[in-house]
Amino acid sequence: MTAQLIDGKALAAQVRQEVEEGVAAFIADGWAAPGLAVVLVGCDAASQVYVENKIRQTEAVGMRSERFLLPADTDESQLLTLIEQLNNNDAIHGILVQFPLPPQIDVSRVISAIHPSKDVDGFNPLNVGRLAAGLEGGLTPCTPLGVMRLIRSVHPDIAGMGALVVGASNVVGRPLARLLLQADCTVSIAHIRTTDLARRCREADILVVATGVPGLIRGDYIKPGATVIDVGISRVRLPNGRDKLTGDVAFEEAVEVAGAITPVPGGVGPMTIAYLLANTLQAARAAVRLR
């Protein structure tokens, strides 16, 4: 068996097209283009590339973007002041603070300072609580939304299927488990300290792995025909001295067992940014409904 490759780039392009059409309709209704503010503290090279990619894609779908580049020695109060200004700016519908932040800044305070209605990352405690309670109206983390779209591209109806999420972070694992549960999956959560992880993986119809441990899930961990979504991405050094991007799943082994699988790169990553755009449009629509 050779697994179907789930093309995250193609699906992300579909999401961006949907957002672009939604933005055009929003503007045609007489509203200003949705606005996304992106805040970067420091000069981490990888973060700068990621921010520029987000801004480029934001503008490509017809939304406005504003970047705020702050020095690495910015203190917490300065960042919180900027966030408050953005909270009060009606032209800004989404606020994204690029992580990681310098050590002098408390990440949890920053997340809580972003108004829930503009929290396009979906990390504010109020949005987390809405998702946990199954309430509508909140913003959901982008990567879990992207993972659900990837899964539904293979299984439009996942009710009754068994899903295992390996990884219990607040960014991916926990919110994703909630979304799967809302879709009537039978959901379990595991992590790197779970005993007998291989057995638990082999019971799953849908296996999502988000641990940041390269090659954690071997081919013999996978139920034949299962759908495997690899959220992890790590840079590993090969014997020849070159670097390679790899996921949490041993791809060459897994592709011979799974029914469908995401590649790394080109699987989950493009979907995360696509749903950042979708969340920004959702936030803009919600804002005008309140006027």
Curated annotation (Swiss-Prot):
GO MF: methenyltetrahydrofolate cyclohydrolase activity; methylenetetrahydrofolate dehydrogenase (NADP+) activity
CDD domains to which the protein is assigned, alphabetical: NAD_bind_m-THF_DH_Cyclohyd (cd01080)
GO cellular component: cytosol
SUPFAM superfamilies the record matches: Aminoacid dehydrogenase-like, N-terminal domain, NAD(P)-binding Rossmann-fold domains
Superkingdom, natural source: Bacteria
Keyword field contains Amino-acid biosynthesis: yes
EC number: 1.5.1.5, 3.5.4.9
InterPro entries for this protein: Aminoacid_DH-like_N_sf, NAD(P)-bd_dom_sf, THF_DH/CycHdrlase, THF_DH/CycHdrlase_cat_dom, THF_DH/CycHdrlase_CS, THF_DH/CycHdrlase_NAD-bd_dom
UniProt keyword Amino-acid biosynthesis present: yes
Gene Ontology terms describing biological process: L-histidine biosynthetic process; methionine biosynthetic process; purine nucleotide biosynthetic process; tetrahydrofolate interconversion
Binding site for NADP(+): G167, A168, S169, I192, I233
Keywords: Amino-acid biosynthesis, Histidine biosynthesis, Hydrolase, Methionine biosynthesis, Multifunctional enzyme, NADP, One-carbon metabolism, Oxidoreductase, Purine biosynthesis
Biological pathway: One-carbon metabolism; tetrahydrofolate interconversion
Record family assignment: Belongs to the tetrahydrofolate dehydrogenase/cyclohydrolase family.
Function: Catalyzes the oxidation of 5,10-methylenetetrahydrofolate to 5,10-methenyltetrahydrofolate and then the hydrolysis of 5,10-methenyltetrahydrofolate to 10-formyltetrahydrofolate.
NCBIfam families the UniProt entry points to: PRK10792.1, PRK14188.1
Subunit-structure text: Homodimer.
Protein name per its UniProtKB record: Bifunctional protein FolD 1
Organism expressing this protein natively: Pseudomonas putida (strain ATCC 47054 / DSM 6125 / CFBP 8728 / NCIMB 11950 / KT2440)
